[in-house]
Every structure is written in structure tokens, then in C-alpha cells.
């Protein structure tokens, strides 16, 4: 995997490596593989939708937004559906490379429909507080099966006073086009937020499914204008555009990608 190449080049600076790779992961996760990242610069973006709008902190990629932002989003015309997401980020570099745990709304698979999961696993996500739907690629690499327990040591403090988290594999998700997107696990944001001791009531991003690309542009503008002067200003736009902007803030990603070929 390409993360191995990144690790070899940066392993001596572990803190810088962690921050750099996590920054790139957030941007690249919207596309999954280096081939797709490269296609950003040719205009041939696979698996993305102009109707999917990302809302995230304006000035800090790793910042948080209050969950209360969704109250305004719910009132906007043209919003077909939306979901919230946060990240359970592993402290250790090695475990981070194994995948990221996404804490999301249970309707994740309705809004982000380039991912698919069975009805049974989605029901478990809603009813079992410890349930996790694991990416098929990660499950295959680790030999995971339904009922297995996965463990991670993360940056969020658990109610037991530790940074240790565990989840039960309730099913598997697949990506319609980009298999690299299957390196992760999805858990229920509500139960995660209830269990963590810090940063309660916050989210990393909001994804909106707009009724059309045109409606999406209007929605993005209204959201950013609404929170422009608040302590939690937003940056909103189509997922493809947001990924390009995030990648551009980190480095010349096209140069990085092409250097591996």
C-alpha cells in the first residue's frame, strides 16, 4: 500500500509523520487510491457526486463543529438528507495505518451511497452501541468475521478513564468503485459521543445530500454565510472540490503521486 512508502520516507519524524499522513488521509479518503487522487488533476474524478456537500471547520482541518449546526441545515430548501461524522484517531502511527474509525449518523449509507452495507448490519449499527461495520478490504486483510472484537487506542477519552476503545464487528461495507475506501470502520456517532469524556456534542464534518448540484451550491453559500462571524465558521462545497482544496493545503499532491509511478 502507498502508506508504506510514505512511512519509509518519514518514519524518523514520528509526530510530523502522524500529522502529515492524517492530513493526507482525510483528503484522500474521499477518493480511496492514488489513481483517483491523480485523476483530480485531470478532471476525471471517480466515485464522487456533485450533489454531496461537505461542511467542515473553515480554519482548521482537524477542528470541530458543534452538532447544533445541523439545526440550521435542517431548515434549508434543497437538502434531501444529511449525516454527521467524526473521527476516532489512533494515537500510535502503526495502528493509524490499519484504518480509521468513522463515527457517523446511522443513515451514513443512505447519504454516502457509493458505499454499501447489508440491512442487517445497518440495523445493528442503530441498535447495538458497540457495533462496527468494517470495510471489506480491511476485514480481508485482518481476517475479521462477524462477532469479532476490534480494539484501538485513540485520542478520545473513554468513560472508563482510558483511551482504549473496542467494537464488535456487525457486518462489512463495500465501495462501489474504489476499493481503497474499504480501509476503515463505521460506528454510531450517538453512542460514541455519549461514551467519550471530551469534545462531547462536536463533529468533524457534515455531509449533505442535495437535491441537485445547483441546489448544493446555494446550500453551501447559505451555510458559510450563516456561520461566517461565529467561533465555528464553516467551509462548504462539493466533496471533490473540498478534497482538492485540502490536498492543496498540504503539498503538491500531484507531484507526490507521480513520484511513485
Spans of features found by a protein language model:
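N-terminal Sec/SRP start-transfer signal
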Residues: 1-31, 35, 247
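Hydrophobic, regular-secondary-structure patches
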Residues: 25-100, 123-127, 140, 221, ...
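Peri-transmembrane interface segments
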Residues: 37, 41-44, 216-261
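Short, surface-exposed amphipathic charged segments that create phosphate/polyanion-binding patches used
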Residues: 97-103, 249-253
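Short beta-strand boundary microenvironments
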Residues: 99-142, 146-149
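Basic-flanked hydrophobic alpha-helices used for secretion and membrane insertion
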Residues: 114, 133, 139-237
